[in-house]
Design a protein with these regions (language model features):
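Active-site loop of short-chain dehydrogenase/reductase
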Residues: 8, 56-57, 84-85, 131-144, ...
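Conserved glycine-rich cofactor-binding loop
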Residues: 9, 16-17
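Conserved glycine-rich Rossmann-like NAD(P)H-binding loop of the short-chain dehydrogenase/reductase
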Residues: 30-46
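The beta1-alpha1 cofactor-binding region of Rossmann-like NAD(H)/NADP(H)-dependent oxidoreductases
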Residues: 42, 62-73, 106
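Substrate-binding pocket helix/loop in short-chain dehydrogenase/reductase
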Residues: 99-101, 105-110
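Catalytic loop of short-chain dehydrogenase/reductase
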Residues: 132, 138-163, 168-177, 189
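C-terminal helical subdomain
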Residues: 177-178, 184-185, 192, 200-243
Length: 246
């Protein structure tokens, strides 16, 4: 079934490249007005060109997500122009370093937590009232299997993704009696710059292109979606529930 997001307003962070770039394009192609947030102006302008060439609409927001006051202002600006928000895709994130935990520098750990966790919370806080005004608010928080695998040398990134998944589930419980649906999306290994940084010896041609992963994730923005508080595994195209340790 074709996804119809005509008249919907969507925010996508980390929209200048990778999975976020293609999610933004898919949302626009489905009819949503995309508010594209990223710190890289050139990437945003390229995205804008692609969206408009396909007949879509976008508003560009050059914003570094370490700018917490800027995130706070974003919600007010959206309310002033559109009066609501229908879709949030919290995609922006950084890897940090793949390193023994005892060798991770404090500034590196703090940057991962600031971008991946604190800015996601500030973003949620900024737009939560607007999503509640929508008749079908949808929030998609990008996560990773690293949140559960606790693999060696991935501690900062893994901890940050475990944190955002926990926030997602808590937020979903808070809003379960509202039209708002809140889920995490685990894209799995994808042909992105972050993956190349994490696993430099891997052949990228063996991985799915971010455009393919975006096509699987975007249906989570559908007004018909019923699921909330779950993790969508793009690799397997399925929802799974978080399992408490036994």
């Amino acid at each position: 079934m074709t996804l119809d997001l005509t008249g919907r307003v969507a925010v996508v962070t980390g929209a200048s490249r990778g999975i976020g770039y293609f999610i933004a394009r898919e949302l626009a192609a489905a009819g949503a007005h995309v508010i594209a947030v990223a710190r890289t102006v050139g990437g945003l302008e390229e995205l804008d060109d692609q969206i408009k060439a396909a007949g879509g609409q976008a508003t560009l927001v050059p914003l570094d997500l370490v700018d917490m006051a800027g995130i706070d202002r974003l919600g007010g600006a959206i309310h002033e122009r559109w009066g609501k928000l229908d879709i949030l895709v919290a995609n922006a994130g950084v890897l940090g370093v793949i390193s023994p935990i005892g060798h991770v520098e404090a500034k590196t750990f703090e940057k991962v937590m600031t971008i991946n966790v604190t800015s996601t919370w500030r973003l949620i806080r900024s737009v939560d009232p607007l999503l509640r005004l929508s008749d079908a608010g949808r929030a998609i928080i990008l996560s990773s299997n690293a949140a559960h695998s606790a693999r060696a040398f991935w501690a900062p990134y893994a901890a940050s993704k475990a944190a955002v998944e926990t926030m997602m589930r808590s937020w979903a419980h808070e809003t379960e009696n509202l039209p708002l649906r809140v889920n995490a999306a685990d894209p799995g290994p994808t042909r992105t710059a972050m993956r190349a940084q994490a696993v430099p010896g891997e052949d990228p041609e063996t991985l799915p292109h971010p455009s393919e992963i975006a096509k699987r994730i975007v249906p989570l923005a559908s007004p018909d979606l019923k699921e909330t508080g779950l993790i969508f595994q793009a690799k397997h195209n399925r929802f799974v529930a978080y399992r408490q340790p036994e």
